[in-house]
Amino acid sequence: MSVKIFNGEFDIPENSRSLYILVIATTDISLIPGLTVAGATPELTHFTPAADAEFLIKGKCSVINTVPVTPNGIPTPAIITRASLEFVKIPRLVVNAGSRIKPNLPLIDLGGEPGGDIRKGSLRKEVAERILNNGVSLGEEFSNSFDFLIIGESIPAGTTTAMAVLVGLGYDALDKVSSASPENPKELKKKIVYEAIKDLPSDLMGKLAKLSDPMLLGVSGIALGFKGKILLAGGTQMTAAAAIIKEFNKNKLKDIAIGTTKWIINDRSSDIIGLAKAVGIPILAAWLDFTNSKFEGLKVYEKGFVKEGVGAGGASIYAMKRGVTNEQILGKVEEIYQRITTNLM
C-alpha cells in the first residue's frame, strides 16, 4: 500500500481546492554542536530553512550556493517535496514565522522573530502571541479560497523544541521524538529540555514563549484559523503542533491528521504513533521506498538518514492519493538529485 494510516481515519477530500504551505523558522539551539544534521555545519543550519524554501519554489538556492545538505552530503528532503508536488500542480506558498535568514522570494511574514535558546527562553511573550494570532488571521483568510491545507516545516533542531513543548504540556515525550540522523542524540536533547523546563511559567502562552520555536506557533495558528481539513506534513514535530492546537481548540483535531513518511514510522529511536495517540490525532504515512534507487545518496534514506522534512511525507501522500506511484516519485526525485549533485561537483 502506498499510504498507510494509524490511530484512526482521515480522508483527503476529492477535488479539493488545496494549498501547500511551508512554514520556516530558526532556533538558536541548532547552533549546539551535535544536536542536528540539518545543515553541513551548526552555523549553516540557520540558512537551511531559507534555502529549503528557495529550492521548493524556484528549484535552486541563492542564500547559499547549493541545496542544504547534512554533514555527510545528503541533500535536503525538499527534493522529495518538489518532486511530489510537480505531479499534482497545487499552489505553494512560504510563510516566515521567524527565520534568521530570509529567502529571496515572495512570502508571507507573520511578524515573528528567530527563536532563541530555549534554556534561557525562546521568545518574548508578545512575539509568541503575535506569531500565533497572525497565523490564525492567515488561516481564516486561506479559508476563503481553499478547503484543504498541507502544512510543511523547515527548522533545524525542531525535534528538540517539539520535545520541550510536549513535555511542558504534560506529555511523556522524552524518548519519543525523531532525528534527521540515524544516531538520535537523545541524551543531548534531554539535557537541553530538562534545563528548558526549569522555572516554567504556569500560563499556557508563558510556557509556549519559553519552549516553542516560531514554526510551531505559526503552524498552530494557521491551523486554528483555517475552516477546512489540514494535513500537518512532518514528523514528530507535528505532534507538538497538534498538542498546541488541542490546548486552544480540542474540537479542531477532528479536521487534522499528521502526514509523514514510513522512515519516521519505522524509526526505532522515536515513537510518533504513541505521541499522536496521546494527543489524539491520526497519522498518514507515505510508504516511499528508495531501495532500488541508482543513487547512494537516496538509498541511505532506507538506513535512517534524513527521514522527513519540508513536508516531504505530506506532499508524497497527496500525490499518491491522486494515483502517483512510488516509482514515479522516485524517478522524479532521481532526476532532481542528478541535477543538483552535478551542480555540487
UniProtKB/Swiss-Prot annotation:
GO terms for molecular function: nicotinate-nucleotide-dimethylbenzimidazole phosphoribosyltransferase activity. PANTHER family: PTHR38811, UPF0284 PROTEIN SLL1500 (PTHR38811:SF1). NCBIfam families: nicotinate mononucleotide-dependent phosphoribosyltransferase CobT, PRK04447.1-1, PRK04447.1-5. Belongs to the UPF0284 family. This is UPF0284 protein STK_21430. It comes from Sulfurisphaera tokodaii (strain DSM 16993 / JCM 10545 / NBRC 100140 / 7) (Sulfolobus tokodaii). The lineage of its organism: Archaea, Thermoproteota, Thermoprotei, Sulfolobales, Sulfolobaceae.
